[in-house]
Amino acid sequence: MADRGGFQSGFGGRGGGRGGARPAGDRPAGRGGRGGRGGRGGRGGRAGRGGEKETEWTPVTKLGRLVKEKKITTLEEIYLNSLPIKEFEIIDALCSNLKDEVLKISPVQKQTTAGQRTRFKAFVAIGDHAGHVGLGVKCSKEVATAIRGAIVAAKLAVVPVRRGYWGNKIGLPHTVPCKVTGKCASVMVRLIPAPRGTGIVSAPVPKKLLHMAGIEDCYTAAKGSTATLGNFAKATYAALQRTYSYLTPDLWKEEALEKSPYQRHHEYLARN
């Protein structure tokens, strides 16, 4: 066994092959220890791999191409024409000051033939505190993957929130324009306009969504199983989404019908 190098390095291991462990003085210069790979730094170490490089966005939809070429510069132009947003990069390009917050991360289990499979469900709210809010839900095997997926889903679900006044139209809009109601499963949330300076009178979950939507003063009423955070957040999101569903008297004025961005820029879309 001694002639073959023994068990330590008899089969070409890190010790130097069948000839046994190579003496320290016979090692070639510059290769270091640990099998001749220069130790921990031989492959660049932790810093040698670098972070993830951001690749340039290549849009795959017509709307994405128009946004990248600055043909569309606001989210309102997209909402007024009811254009579906299929790429989250569109939101990043038009609304760069979005803030996201993780509402909850809960483990969920599924019974399989091999046993219980555990995954993680993430609820993420996103908004710019200026009339745009979104809510995303994602389930994944890892927490980080679930959060990233929920952020993408929230960006694709960003909706405009209409703000109004409680009494006289003095200053900037600060509350919801009228009473609105949202429902999800057994949870029902009602948003009620409030005077300036009242603040958001609400439970913690709707308060975060209302704050991200840019609403400063609001009364809320909720009923149902509000302990279910997911349904509570979805009901609040549905209520905020309905702020543009009511045609109040200040919107009765008729306006000329404009062409959609696809019609205005059809020549550019045909060339590219």
From Swiss-Prot:
GO terms for cellular component: cytosolic small ribosomal subunit. Pfam families: Ribosomal_S5 (PF00333), Ribosomal_S5_C (PF03719). Disulfide bonds: none annotated. PROSITE patterns: RIBOSOMAL_S5, S5_DSRBD. GO terms for molecular function: RNA binding; structural constituent of ribosome. The keyword Flavoprotein does not apply. Residues 7-22, 30-48 have a biased composition (Gly residues). Residues 1-57 are annotated as: Disordered. Residues 98-161 form the S5 DRBM domain. InterPro entries: Ribosomal_Su5_D2-typ_SF, Ribosomal_uS5, Ribosomal_uS5_C, Ribosomal_uS5_euk/arc, Ribosomal_uS5_N, Ribosomal_uS5_N_CS, Ribsml_uS5_D2-typ_fold_subgr. GO terms for biological process: translation. The keyword Repeat applies. It comes from the Eukaryota. Disruption phenotype: RNAi-mediated knockdown results in a significant reduction of the mRNA levels of ztf-7 and blocking cold-warm shock-induced exosome translocation from the nucleolus to nucleoplasm. Keywords: Repeat, Ribonucleoprotein, Ribosomal protein. Interacts with ztf-7. Belongs to the universal ribosomal protein uS5 family. Component of the ribosome, a large ribonucleoprotein complex responsible for the synthesis of proteins in the cell. The small ribosomal subunit (SSU) binds messenger RNAs (mRNAs) and translates the encoded message by selecting cognate aminoacyl-transfer RNA (tRNA) molecules. The large subunit (LSU) contains the ribosomal catalytic site termed the peptidyl transferase center (PTC), which catalyzes the formation of peptide bonds, thereby polymerizing the amino acids delivered by tRNAs into a polypeptide chain. This is Small ribosomal subunit protein uS5. It comes from Caenorhabditis elegans. The lineage of its organism: Eukaryota, Metazoa, Ecdysozoa, Nematoda, Chromadorea. The gene is rps-2.
